[in-house]
């Protein structure tokens, strides 16, 4: 992948999302559309953003019984996304069925532990061990289920890459060295994540909320 940056288009207005994508398309490798975008704009919105000409990452984080998730995967097949997310916490059978229902050219990756969660959150959720430990466990399960890869923070990607040499690793929650953390609790810089083995770097607010999004995207690209 020549440019691993996927811009998170988490904007409420479709026209604004398309305009931003057009502005920065020369400095990113793909576009990530999350649950908020998909619920607001549906298939039509995805088709409109796809006209920009970059790969589409549908970050829907599907999590339900195996049959329901498989049905959802079949429903979005027509959109031809490059990447789709499901939750590893849905279990092995759910992950296997999701992969079987996905399009031939769609990578199915499992979310391990959200980057907004830390060790204290693991404890309150009744999960034994740290966020790092849980991410490793769920990554192993995703590999056993035959998925293409996982979503994890930059803190875990290096260790998981060593256990899964040919895995596809998506790392969100990235912030430039001078950036604000916001609601991210386990953030690293884009360069650190890339050096640790990340395949895709998901970056949203540091670009989308910058005074000059093109300059921000170019600056991050230059660090890689």
UniProtKB/Swiss-Prot annotation:
EC main group: lyase
Entries under Pfam families matching the protein: OMPdecase (PF00215)
The keyword Lyase belongs to this UniProt entry's keyword annotation: yes
Lyase among keywords: yes
GO biological process per UniProt: 'de novo' pyrimidine nucleobase biosynthetic process; 'de novo' UMP biosynthetic process
E.C. designation(s): 4.1.1.23
Subunit details: Homodimer.
Protein name, as recorded: Orotidine 5'-phosphate decarboxylase
Source species: Novosphingobium aromaticivorans (strain ATCC 700278 / DSM 12444 / CCUG 56034 / CIP 105152 / NBRC 16084 / F199)
Name of the coding gene: pyrF
């Amino acid at each position: 992948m020549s440019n691993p940056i996927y811009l998170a288009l988490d904007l409420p207005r479709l026209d604004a999302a398309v305009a931003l994508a057009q502005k920065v398309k020369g400095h990113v490798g793909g576009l990530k559309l999350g649950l908020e975008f998909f619920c607001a704009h549906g298939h039509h919105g995805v088709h409109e953003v796809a006209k920009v000409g970059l790969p589409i990452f549908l970050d829907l984080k599907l999590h339900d019984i195996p049959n329901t998730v498989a049905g959802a995967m079949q429903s979005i097949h027509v959109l031809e996304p490059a990447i789709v997310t499901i939750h590893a916490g849905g279990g092995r059978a759910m992950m296997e069925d999701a992969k079987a229902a996905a399009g031939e050219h769609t990578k199915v990756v499992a979310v391990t532990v959200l980057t907004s969660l830390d060790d204290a959150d693991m404890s309150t959720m009744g999960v034994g061990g740290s966020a790092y430990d849980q991410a490793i466990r769920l990554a192993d399960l995703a590999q056993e289920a035959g998925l293409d890869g996982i979503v994890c923070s930059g803190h875990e990607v290096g260790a998981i890459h060593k256990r899964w040499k040919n895995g596809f690793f998506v790392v969100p929650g990235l912030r430039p060295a001078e950036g604000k953390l916001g609601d991210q609790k386990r953030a690293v810089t884009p360069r650190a994540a890339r050096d640790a083995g990340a395949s895709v770097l998901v970056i949203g607010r540091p670009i989308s909320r910058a005074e000059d999004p093109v300059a921000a995207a170019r600056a991050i690209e230059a660090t890689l």
